[in-house]
Amino acid sequence: MVNYPHHFIRKQSKPSQISKTINFANRGMSFEAAINATNNYYLSQKIAVIHKKPTPIQIVRVDYPRRSRAKIVEAYFRQASTTDYSGVYKGYYIDFEAKETRHKTSIPMKNFHAHQIKHMSQVLDQKGICFVLLHFSTLRETYLLPASHLIHFYRIDNGGKSMPLDYIKKNGYQVNVSAFPQVPYLDIIDKNILGGD
């Protein structure tokens, strides 16, 4: 014990319990930022080259309040975007979408659009690896769902229903988040899609 001046006794605080589950919200990080960090890790370790696709935007009007400051006031999407991420892993083309929800029992299919479903189907037709990463923020659970199962569910009623978590658990794979990489989805690709260890 350390004796402080004026007989001040420092109270020993008990170490707090550390949650085993990483919560992106508690760390000030969005699900998308965690995926981007994962992709940066994969790139730096020469495991895969996967990037977020830029969204093409048409700038219509810009205000210049000062010469050095331009402010975009009006802009539109040039075309409907396909999926969020694409790249190459072990010679395979990878293409995936990432969605986050606060719902506990399902994910709304309105989050997926017909042009995205069509794009995913085209990727699968070319033997690419296509999937969605689904993060249930309230439950702190993340799943990888192969695109074939998303497409099948979407076509039941043209994306009008919500996809139950039970369907995702039955047809997908839980991603166990970690420190490095944060969202290790390639582990699931290796084990369950490519058939490796």
UniProtKB/Swiss-Prot annotation:
Listed Gene3D superfamilies: 3.40.1350.10
E.C. number(s) listed in UniProt: 3.1.21.10
Pfam families (alphabetical)? RecU (PF03838)
Q: What is its main location?
A: cytoplasm
Per the entry, the cofactor note is: Binds 1 Mg(2+) ion per subunit.
Provide the protein's localization: Cytoplasm
Query: Which superkingdom is the protein from?
Result: Bacteria
- Identify one Gene Ontology CC term for this UniProt entry: cytoplasm
Instruction: Describe the reaction catalysed, as an equation.
Output: Endonucleolytic cleavage at a junction such as a reciprocal single-stranded crossover between two homologous DNA duplexes (Holliday junction)
User: What protein am I looking at?
Assistant: Holliday junction resolvase RecU
The species this protein was found in: Streptococcus mutans serotype c (strain ATCC 700610 / UA159)
